[in-house]
């Protein structure tokens, strides 16, 4: 019906099917091999991973494949700026290097990650990679304490950068009153499950962590984008400043 309404042509050669299951067991093998899916008299094979909207979804490795794709894209973007003065032998200003990295490279690293439900281990992979890049750009020792790295760089850790983008995405959903995502958010947050791992419940945990209003309240009364962004930025900066200062 969607294809007929919007005049969309489906090409079987471009289809990619990925089967997700909690355990890679015989049941998944049965679903993918014994029950094939046909389109235009052709069998659509199942893949271990597929790309959608710039993100790679994997049936075996969770979000790690998408994260590694973002790290590789960030590395390519960073290397493309080396001739502009970021290379070590250019002896460029570390502060300028950090600023250029923040403007041109950080968005590439964080692109799409805010929409994923990341585990603590996956967030740690991103944080360690980002911290290592800061150390190299500022020419610091590898054992430099975290507070010194982020205070000298004048930037937030990768985890905080990710939280900022998650709040921005959630605020956008709050203003989409008739959108299916808004309805799913209200439905998900109205029923509270213990240790729920959904994306919207992660937003609720982040609101509690930073002392923000409950996300269900914001869905019913969406704050203005500018005010909400300033409030989130202020709360996140305050939280991480106290955390890093206490660790120093």
Predicted region positions:
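Short amphipathic alpha-helical coiled-coil/interface segments
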Residues: 74, 126-137, 203, 236
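Basic, alpha-helical interaction scaffolds
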Residues: 36-117, 172, 180
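Short, charged alpha-helical motifs in flexible N/C-terminal segments and linkers
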Residues: 7, 16, 132-194
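Acidic, serine/threonine/proline-rich low-complexity intrinsically disordered regions
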Residues: 116-124
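Charged boundary/loop elements
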Residues: 13, 111, 116, 173-248
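Catalytic palm subdomain of template-directed nucleic-acid polymerases
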Residues: 1-4, 22-27, 59-63
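Short, conserved micro-motifs composed of acidic
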Residues: 8-48, 69
């Amino acid at each position: 019906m969607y294809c007929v309404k919007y005049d969309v042509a489906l090409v079987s050669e471009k289809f990619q099917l990925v089967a997700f299951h909690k355990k890679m067991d015989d049941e998944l093998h049965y679903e993918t091999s014994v029950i094939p899916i046909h389109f235009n008299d052709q069998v659509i094979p199942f893949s271990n991973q597929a790309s959608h909207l710039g993100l790679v979804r994997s049936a075996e490795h969770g979000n790690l494949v998408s994260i590694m794709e973002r790290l590789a894209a960030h590395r390519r973007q960073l290397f493309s700026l080396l001739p502009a003065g970021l290379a070590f032998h250019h002896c460029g200003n570390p502060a300028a290097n950090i600023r250029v990295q923040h403007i041109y490279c950080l968005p590439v690293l964080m692109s799409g990650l805010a929409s994923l439900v990341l585990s603590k281990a996956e967030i740690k992979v991103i944080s360690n990679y980002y911290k290592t890049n800061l150390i190299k750009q500022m020419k610091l020792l590898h054992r430099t304490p975290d507070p010194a790295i982020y205070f000298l760089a004048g930037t937030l850790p990768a985890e905080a950068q990710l939280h900022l983008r998650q709040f921005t995405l959630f605020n956008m959903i709050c203003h989409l009153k008739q959108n299916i995502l808004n309805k799913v958010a209200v439905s998900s947050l109205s029923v509270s499950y213990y240790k729920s791992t959904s994306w919207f419940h992660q937003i609720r945990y982040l609101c509690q962590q930073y002392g923000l209003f409950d996300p269900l309240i914001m869905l019913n009364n969406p704050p203005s984008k500018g005010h909400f962004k300033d409030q989130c930025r202020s709360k996140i900066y305050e939280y991480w400043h106290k955390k890093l200062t206490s660790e120093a």
